[in-house]
Amino acid sequence: IAEAPEKYLRAGMGDTLGKYFECHFAARGDRLEHSSALGREISNMCYFPLLEYAEAALEECRHKKAGKALEQAVLANIVSTGLVSLLVLDQYNCAVAHSVYYGLVLLDGFEAENLHGDVVAYGVLVQLLVDGEEEKAKEMKTFLKNLKIRTTLKEMGASVKRETLREVLHEIVTGPDMEHIPYEITEDMVYDAMVKVEELVG
């Protein structure tokens, strides 16, 4: 993994961060059975180790070095996410962040230019703002920018114009990852969050 392109490690981190935020969001208010409750707790290990080790892990990968930081990031990216996916019910595996990805890839050429995990990380910002967590969104935007993950539609080569995003917004709110969430989310809510992400100062 230390010899692999850095961009794939980075994208893996973005997808892994999504696991933490989406699992906690989708499970909110539910009385979880043991397996799903355990998986949700393990999802913390998809987040906190990356806060500590992600930047150093990318630096190690850049220099083809298999050090402690890279090891911890890989454990989060592969082991922690795998355990969560196996333990929780499917309805707790994804939420807004992944649905944002599946909406945006409807745009011509978008998927070819943006890795899955990078877009999921952007989707985390959208999810946080939909949920009213502006300060957390600012904190996460700063973190993602430090990892060199694109944090706006403009950076990803897409327009934030409502008409351009018409099909995208429909897919986001009607996609299968949105079937089990704590409250109804509308196209207006998602679009407003996307606009805020563009302007958010992290």
Residue ranges and their predicted role:
Residues 133-202:
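C-terminal charged capping/lid subdomain of soluble metabolic enzymes
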Residues 17-21, 70-84, 124, 144, ...:
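Short alpha-helical scaffolding segments that buttress acidic/His motifs in well-ordered protein cores
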Residues 1-42:
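A glycine/threonine-rich phosphate-anchoring loop and its flanking beta-alpha core
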Residues 32-143:
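Active-site segments that bind and position negatively charged phosphate/pyrophosphate groups
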